[in-house]
Swiss-Prot record:
Topology class, membrane: Single-pass membrane protein
UniProt-recorded name of the protein: NADH-cytochrome b5 reductase 1
Summary of the function given for this chain in its UniProt record: NADH-dependent reductase for dph3 and cytochrome b5. Required for the first step of diphthamide biosynthesis, a post-translational modification of histidine which occurs in elongation factor 2. Dph1 and dph2 transfer a 3-amino-3-carboxypropyl (ACP) group from S-adenosyl-L-methionine (SAM) to a histidine residue, the reaction is assisted by a reduction system comprising dph3 and a NADH-dependent reductase, predominantly cbr1. By reducing dph3, also involved in the formation of the tRNA wobble base modification mcm5s 2U (5-methoxycarbonylmethyl-2-thiouridine), mediated by the elongator complex.
Pfam families in alphabetical order: FAD_binding_6, NAD_binding_1
GO cellular component term of the entry, any: mitochondrial outer membrane
Amino acid sequence: MSALSSENINGVYIPSALLLFGTFIVKKEFVPYAVAVTAILAGLKLFTGGNKPRKVLNPTEFQEFVLKEKIDVSHNVCIYRFALPRPTDILGLPIGQHISLAATIEGQPKEVVRSYTPISSDNEAGYFDLLVKAYPQGNISKYLTTLKIGDTMKVRGPKGAMVYTPNMCRHIGMIAGGTGITPMLQIIKAVIRNRPRNGGNDTTKLDLIFANVNPDDILLKEELDMLAAEDPDFNIYYVLNNPPQGWTGGVGFVTPEMIKEHLPAPASDVKILLCGPPPMISAMKKATESLGYTKARPVSKLEDQVFCF
């Protein structure tokens, strides 16, 4: 018997049966009213799901979710907010994992599937947010720009080898490029939300190197800066290819020297997370290996010291 059906039996059917039985014994003419009350209670239970969060993701089948809002971040970056079936629903996405989006694109021989990490979490019920940059050659990212409010997107998940758990290591170093910030933000927010001062137990130290081309390309900078300001164990080092005058962060590409200065040194309780454009990730794999970190595998596993999303 499923948890839901067991809950329904204990929460609705047994009390309802007792109500009907008691009414029949005490006053038979009130039985129709008791039946009506029972039907209403059962309907409310079925419709609301008991107001408990329901995980809606399915790892084997695509489901369609309705676009409810589009928030422009820049000329080519947008936050897409998709509604879940019920206001109390959650995606059910473990921290560190991602989802697959699928669409039929004109000119493509088969359905196109791409992976994205929501910037929202299961702490926010009723919807999920995707931060997406539209690339000229990006099939799904361009497809998303054509969606209108009320249109649907096919989603499947969760997927991915990374599942973050509190205190899985002492210190995490992160290197992100562009929209590669999304899985990092997911983990950063989860760690800070679970700090001892917030009633949790996560003491993991976090250091982030975030590389972009121009200042306007730094996604979610305001939120990242706010998180760093409130948490002394989270530090950010920004790197720009085209820095403005007076820039105090890094300049050019992320170098081994930057990694050595701003991220934790290799140790058994240290993990390095990478996410960004393929050329950047290739360079960062070589850089981390040159500094003594364990060589990154072609396909990362949870236990790897250097993990690539």
